[in-house]
A protein has these predicted regions:
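Peripheral, non-catalytic segments flanking oxidoreductase cores
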Residues: 1-252
Length: 252
């Protein structure tokens, strides 16, 4: 990853820190493919760039498979946010303003190594990745291996296991969608615990739906997203009241 200003590429084990602790994971970061930005483009355009793919010799077909997967997930994620808009009694295209024609979306391939036997005997709870919220609109997690470890936090602050179910994706709400829906769609706090000793590595493939880097959120009222119907916001207020006034589930 250090070879590219796009932050796309490979990250070694234990290279990141979340909530003050080292994450025990290694990963590849990819995105829907884009050319290098033109000279004079804003610095944030460096995020839109070609991927650093493994060689075809080392992993035959890898690039084609994941390019196709990102294309299909891109289409599905746009359709999904259209359904969210409809569910909130907004126009189906309420979110379209925030997508480029060639919108960049991102994908990770993540490996979480198992705890060592010594750590497990000492009662260590390994941090695969610490508690956090995704920043984008929505994310879609494919749990590749049959490992527990993914947990989500409910409004009471309790961590709930999210075990893998074959043939399904785990969908999470990101902070951008929470902002666009005036808090009706609450972003999901989640974490991953390291696999138990001897169980092998946990593998997962999260896909992150992006938004335009130059989107202006002060234009909400013009596109309808800012005009969330009062009855929808009232449902959210009732849930907050039911949970003792708690409006943020972050406990880290």
């Amino acid at each position: 990853m250090k070879n590219a200003p796009s932050f796309l590429g490979y990250s070694r084990l234990a290279a990141e820190i979340t909530a003050g602790k080292t994450d025990q994971r290694e990963q590849f970061d990819f995105s829907t493919e884009h050319p290098l930005p033109k000279p004079g483009a804003p610095l944030y355009e460096n995020l839109r760039a070609p991927n650093q793919w493994p060689s075809e010799t080392a992993l035959p077909g890898f690039r084609d498979v994941f390019t196709d997967y990102m294309t299909k997930m891109s289409e599905m994620s746009i359709a999904f946010t259209s359904l969210i808009a409809e569910a909130m009694h907004l126009p189906r295209d309420a979110f379209d303003k925030y997508f480029d024609q060639d919108q960049q979306h991102k994908l990770k391939i993540v490996k979480y190594p198992a705890l060592s036997t010594l750590d497990q005997e000492a009662g260590v709870e390994g941090q695969g990745v610490g508690p956090h919220k995704d920043s984008m609109l929505t994310s879609y997690l494919l749990q590749v291996t049959n490992h527990r470890g993914l947990q989500v936090q409910n409004v009471a602050g309790t961590w709930i296991d999210c075990p893998p179910i074959p043939g399904t994706l785990v969908v999470a709400i990101g902070q951008a969608l929470e902002a666009l829906t005036q808090g009706v769609c609450v972003s999901t706090t989640h974490r991953v615990l390291s696999p138990s000793a001897g169980s092998g590595a946990r593998l997962s493939i999260p896909f992150f739906q992006g938004v335009r880097y130059d989107a202006e959120f002060d234009e909400l009222d013009e596109v309808g997203v800012g005009n969330v119907p009062e009855d929808i916001k009232e449902q959210r207020r009732r849930i907050i009241e039911k949970n003792g006034g708690r409006i943020d589930d972050v406990e880290f």
